[in-house]
Amino acid sequence: MSELHALLTFPERPISQSYYVPKLQHFLKSGIPATYTLEQVAAFEHEEKNRNGDKEFRESTDDNKTSNTTPLHVLARSLPLDIKDEELQVVMDMMNILFEYGAGWNFIDYEDKTVGDLFLERNQSRESPLYRRLVEAGVSAELLLRKLNGGDVEFLDTDELIGIEPEESVQTAVDGQKEESVGSDDDATAANQQVYLKTELEYKDDALITKENKDGVMMDWETKIMELASETLFPDPEATNSATILNIGFGMGIIDTFIQARKPYRHYICEAHPDVLAKMKMDGWYEKDNVVILEGRWQDTLNNLLDKGEVFFDGIYYDTFSEHYQDILDLYDVVVGLIKPEGVFSFFNGLGADRSLCYDVYKEIVEIDVATYGMKCDYTRYSLDEQLPDWNDVKRSYFNCNYYYHPRITFA
């Protein structure tokens, strides 16, 4: 452990401005990176031992560590449980200094934890100043990254954070709508819609998955979420029979079943995958009097509706597979033209849900993005403690948080 890391274990109490801040500034001004990891310290010590011919040390060292335990991780892990308010302010000042010198907000440490995870373990709530500061740093970093990319949205994939060098600029796509990170040909189905639409699907009792790779397209643990969403889509609960609703992405038909139970005037379903369309025909969705099936990608079918200008919706829901957050931004352009002034837009919110810190960051980014369209996003926080599956029958989980932020987006 370097002197910088040792300082951040808070060896002296109380945590005072006069003791800690000057020392931290000294280390950073002397050239020690704010992203200097414990793993880099260990690698340096390893090389030193090798130069000195310490064979025993060389053989006992694990060269395969790919975590990034940054100074912020050390600070968060060392936070006293009995910390006082005045000490918290000093810690906040230290965090600000680390961020000024380029500290990252979302690296994964040797225990597979983010700084946010560690703050929560040290009795800092999601609304605490330290956790909120971390979220603010994440939002700022992601928006800056988007700006540097010329407007393209490229969120960090937390699966990719393990093994990257903290000093590197990382530009990889993040989980958008039940998508997985791109890392191999096996992942192409989940990351590329054109590949997905040509991929054979399989309906199981409790899930819709890709037949070969076992990617989870939709699972029945989402039922309560879909029930909540279906209620959101009807702005006037006393006039559901006059409502016109659009759902983008049929999947297992969970939300569409809830929508039908409310007997809307018209129920549009946009679906592009041939296997899903075949299932819809087999289950009688094409024969329902108030249902209109839009076969094809929403990018094509909804633009046709927009051009005609004949149909406007009380509620629009979006839940697709293998699309990115950039696709949601593109959808906003269509939504504002198809939704009624008092209408509601919502979507399955899996943005960054493989890590709770990322999930909290993307929650705020959505609020910022919809505001540019003159809209606002209100969230309902829903506990998932007894709902998440064990993921044994799917290749990789697409939702790891024990809570869900349900978005309700309307014109402000």
From Swiss-Prot:
Main location: cytoplasm
Region listing for Disordered, in residue ranges: 48-69, 169-189
Subcellular location(s) per record: Cytoplasm; Nucleus
Gene3D superfamilies to which the protein is assigned, alphabetical: Vaccinia Virus protein VP39
Positions with biased composition (Basic and acidic residues): 48-65
Phosphoserine modified-residue sites: 181, 184
Gene Ontology cellular-component annotations: cytoplasm; nucleus
RMT2 domain ranges (all copies): 189-412
Entry binding sites for S-adenosyl-L-methionine: 196, 226, 250-255, 271-273, 298-299, 319
GO biological process: methylation
Annotated EC: 2.1.1.-
GO MF, one example: protein arginine N5-methyltransferase activity
UniProt keyword list: Cytoplasm, Methyltransferase, Nucleus, Phosphoprotein, S-adenosyl-L-methionine, Transferase
Family: Belongs to the class I-like SAM-binding methyltransferase superfamily. RMT2 methyltransferase family.
Miscellaneous information on this protein: Present with 1600 molecules/cell in log phase SD medium.
Function: S-adenosyl-L-methionine-dependent protein-arginine N-methyltransferase that methylates the delta-nitrogen atom of arginine residues to form N5-methylarginine (type IV) in target proteins. Monomethylates ribosomal protein L12 (RPL12A/RPL12B) at 'Arg-67'.
Oligomer status and interactors: Monomer. Interacts with nucleoporins NUP49, NUP57 and NUP100.
Listed name of the protein: Protein arginine N-methyltransferase 2
Gene source species: Saccharomyces cerevisiae (strain ATCC 204508 / S288c) (Baker's yeast)
Encoding gene, per UniProt annotation: RMT2
